[in-house]
Amino acid sequence: MKIKSFLVSNLLFLFISLSFTQTGKVYDNLSMQSKILNSERKYAIYLPPDYGSSERRYPVLYLLHGSGDDQTGWIQFGEVLSIADKSVANSTATPMIIVMPDANTGRRGYFNDIKGEWRYEDFFFQEFLPFIEKTYRIKGEKRFRAIAGLSMGGGGSFMYALHHPELFSSACPLSASVGPLSLDEAKKRYRNENKDINDAELENYYNQHNALSLISTLSVDQLKSVRWFIDCGDDDFLYEGNDLVHIALRKKEIPHEYRVRDGSHSWTYWRASLPEVLEFISDAFHQH
């Protein structure tokens, strides 16, 4: 009887230990075919620890990489697997699916180009997002969908949430490129590769791809429909733009979180930001 009790106790301990060490999974070389971009598009995905053992649907975070990286950046350098698993285990974040698209193949960036020849943003909203939310068990409603990203991807998360506030409950730009800070700067930047673009076309493109311009034109209700978390290091070369966005949101009395911590434009900074991002967006997932 003592031997039997000993075996039962050990099996129970082993079962409990295994349940606590259950981890999520990442896949970093997945792909889909895009008609809009006429190419195969790579993406990576994090599935939470209980995804394979349940039939439930999950909230989703679209997590955008920066310039020079691809869909593997947040996995290799951002340590998304260990950070997300730890946040879920600590109950600071809800189990969620994290999707990381590649925006570095063909042309770099998350937007349509000024001539409309490379339509990445159209691809994202018309093909990629519907494909992901059909392929995986995702709660496909605004309140269960968030977007975040770093640097170029921070700019993408700003613009996507400002272009489509009806789709995202939270937006978390980290060290974001907010777009040219003036029309003159935009002319210098865009004219280098688009010398035949007239002033009206250029100004319209600038207004649609500049966070400050979009904040000034969107209604208060539209801006308030998204929960904003903005984070940028005090030594980051993109600090000025993020600070101006913070001021613009304050002037319109838009609730938002603004973090300025000691740090620069680095993975060390972004890895430290990610747990707070996951907690912030989880609050939005839970508030309903």
Locations of the language-model features?
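Non-catalytic cap/lid and distal C-terminal segments of serine-dependent acyl enzymes
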Residues: 22-288
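Bacterial N-terminal signal peptides
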Residues: 9-17
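Positively charged n-region of N-terminal signal peptides that target proteins for export
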Residues: 1-5
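General helical structural elements
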Residues: 6-8, 45
